[in-house]
Regions:
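Short charge-dense sequence patches
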Residues: 4, 32-40, 56-66, 83-90
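Extended, low-complexity, charged alpha-helical tracts
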Residues: 49, 61-65, 70-75, 79-112, ...
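C-terminal segment of N-terminal export signals and the immediately downstream linker at the start
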Residues: 21-58
Length: 150
């Protein structure tokens, strides 16, 4: 049975080796968004967009609480929070190279599309437009990861 130190040590080694591999990847810095003519779709780029989408949905939920009105509709807030959690779970599954990543990425893409559509329904608001755009990008990249080996 693994003790806590071995588990934590293994996680640190995995995180460090991932960082080293990312730093040594040729031509990866400043690549821009995948799927935008900036380079190939990678597991790392999907992790990055999922983390960004997670953060954006949480920030947008907070913004909606402060804004009030249509922004605080229970279904809208629930969708933002569901999307944030799904994006975080997807990033986590990709980081640990889960064999179930295809199913998780597919579900994330569907939820991000729904969140983007809901955010776009609140027109004339830059925060909502930015959230919708990032969710669409995340959905696109997650769809691209569904059948990719990791």
């Amino acid at each position: 049975m693994w003790n806590r130190r071995k588990v934590l040590g293994s996680c640190l080694v995995l995180a460090a080796s991932s960082g080293i591999a990312r730093a040594q990847a040729p031509g990866m810095s400043g690549m821009g968004m995948p799927g935008m003519g900036q380079g190939p779709m990678t597991r790392e780029s999907c992790i990055d967009i999922c983390i960004k989408s997670h953060q954006m949905c949480l920030e947008t939920a907070r913004y909606c609480f402060e804004k009030g009105g249509d922004h605080v509709a229970p279904t809208h807030l629930a969708l933002l929070l569901d999307c944030a959690e799904m994006c975080q779970m997807t990033a986590n599954s990709l980081m640990r190279r889960s064999q179930q990543h295809g199913a998780i990425c597919g579900a994330c893409a569907q939820l991000c599309d729904a969140c983007a559509k809901d955010c776009e329904a609140i027109t004339g608001d830059d925060q909502m437009a930015h959230c919708a755009s990032l969710c669409r990008d995340c959905a696109r990249d997650c769809r691209g990861m569904v059948n990719m080996p990791i």
